[in-house]
């Protein structure tokens, strides 16, 4: 969705017109040999982020990068009983510390597999071989501003393998791609 629709978790109508100054949030799934992927990216319609959009985007990106570094066997995607080991609760705290409390409206991620939102027991710690997303986001409907960055991962003994790392998500890479058509080497 674009504009205020970028603040809706799963905007499906696709009827809004893209307007310069707005963001467009794309949440897409794919399937390969019966296994699913789920990826979200947020792009500035004009090709360049406004200062406010950039600030919000960078907060979301920093949360995702922190979760990527922290994710390891024994952590949880979400678990209210083990908040210090819960990636979701870590994201909530980081957003609160950034002054964005209450603007993160969904879980930090979900399991992937034969379904895009695959079954998984969130009360059991993550273990090597688990496939899941990390998708922090912030949503400000009053500003027509929604940002979500979602990537797919496999957990190993040593941390994460990002299956979607070739998709640009750094601000400079996105702006170069949109304004100059420059592809970035992954």
Question: What positions do the PLM features span?
Answer:
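Active-site neighborhoods and metal-handling regions in enzymes and metal-associated proteins
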Residues: 1-186
């Amino acid at each position: 969705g674009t504009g205020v629709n970028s603040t809706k978790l799963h905007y499906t109508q696709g009827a809004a017109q893209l307007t310069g100054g707005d963001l467009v949030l794309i949440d897409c799934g794919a399937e390969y040999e019966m296994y699913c992927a789920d990826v979200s990216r947020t792009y500035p319609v004009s090709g360049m982020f406004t200062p406010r959009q950039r600030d919000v985007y960078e907060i979301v990106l920093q949360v995702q990068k922190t979760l990527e570094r922290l994710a390891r066997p024994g952590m949880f995607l979400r678990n209210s009983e083990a908040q210090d080991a819960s990636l979701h609760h870590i994201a909530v705290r980081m957003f609160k510390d950034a002054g964005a409390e209450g603007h993160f409206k969904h879980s930090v991620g979900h399991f992937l597999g034969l379904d895009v939102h695959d079954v998984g027991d969130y009360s059991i710690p993550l273990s090597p071989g688990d496939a899941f997303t990390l998708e922090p986001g912030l949503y400000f409907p009053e500003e027509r501003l929604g940002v979500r960055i979602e990537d797919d991962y496999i957990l190993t003994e040593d941390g994460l393998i990002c299956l979607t790392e070739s998709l640009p998500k750094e601000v400079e890479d996105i702006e170069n791609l949109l304004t100059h058509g420059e592809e970035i080497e992954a």
